[in-house]
Amino acid sequence: MGFKIRNFTGDPFAIATVSFGLIAWIVALAGAAASSQGSFPHFTWWGIAYQIVIILVITVLYLNNNIELYKFTLVGLVSIGFIYTTNSTNNLVYNSSSSGNLCCAAGCILLSILNLIWILYFGGHPESPTNQFIDSFSSNKYANEYIGRSSVLKTEPFDDQQGFNSAASKRFTSTGISLPQENVSQMSQTNTHSQQQQHSTNAANASNATSYFPLTQLHGLENSSQDMMGSAPRDLTQNTNTNSSGTKRNTLYTDSEGGTGITFRYKAKALYSYDANPDDINEISFIKDEILDVDDVDGKWWQARRANGQVGICPSNYVKLIDT
């Protein structure tokens, strides 16, 4: 998500409604300031102050690109503002003939119209015709492809021996251990053999696979990083991943499966934009309305593939299955 000006400027609905709201609020404030306070309804000042807070909150949510997460909250807040502005309009129009009061009433009428529009939009389902029509003008619909982070988030399998040798050497060198080249070659050959064996077995046997590297080939080096660095290394023998809360979550695919041998039977549409956790290489980022190929749709995390071929897992409450 993140605070970005283009999140706001790229949405014509946000620019139009917030700008309209600021103009209407200034008109109401100017009328209230010019009115005789003896005949001015004092509670209207609270309504004017409340309205500018709502406008600022909506602006900040658009700038952070998380307006979708607070739509239901905004419906309640804007509904309260709608009551304030309509009540103030009634008191200003019928209980006073002051030009300042009438100017403030005009601003409150404009704010009431704005609040009604926001209630209809934020209260509508993202798949409703009105919301779909409004969102179709947003340039953020297929923007922000997370190019800058794709190299970090994208999981690429080691399909060749040279790539595996390089990665294995870097992994053990970073812990201060010099790994002989023949051991690295032996490990890469074992990895190639395990990949071939995995593709030749059925899905049931593949799901029960518990070893990416045979422990006998590591010669006790599997715990070297923990001993020397004081932190637990990634568990290479279990198909699990540790999230930020410290609990292990089942990974929906292994490193050797990324990009090959996976059948995606369903398609899903992203209801909201999602930024992957940079500490979890298995998660993928996507944007609102993006179409994803998904499988293993049981549970809170689904296996997914983006249009650019990036494979990972996505939260199920951010996407919706669609008919193909």
From Swiss-Prot:
Compartmental location: Cell membrane
Record field: compositional bias (Low complexity): 185-204
Biased composition regions of type Polar residues, renumbered to the chain: 236-254
Record topology, Extracellular segments: 34-42, 87-101
Keywords: Cell membrane, Glycoprotein, Membrane, SH3 domain, Stress response, Transmembrane, Transmembrane helix
Residue intervals on the Cytoplasmic side: 1-12, 64-65, 123-324
Domain named SH3: residues: 263-324
GO BP field: filamentous growth; regulation of actin filament polymerization
Principal location listed in the UniProt entry: membrane
TM region(s), chain numbering: 13-33, 43-63, 66-86, 102-122
GO cellular component: plasma membrane
Pfam families named among the record's database cross-references: SH3_1
Residues carrying covalently attached carbohydrate according to the record: N87, N95
Spans annotated as Disordered: 183-204, 223-254
SUPFAM superfamilies, sorted: SH3-domain
Assembly and oligomerization: Forms homooligomers.
Biological role: Plasma membrane osmosensor that activates the high osmolarity glycerol (HOG) MAPK signaling pathway in response to high osmolarity.
Family: Belongs to the SHO1 family.
Protein name: High osmolarity signaling protein SHO1
Source organism: Lodderomyces elongisporus (strain ATCC 11503 / CBS 2605 / JCM 1781 / NBRC 1676 / NRRL YB-4239)
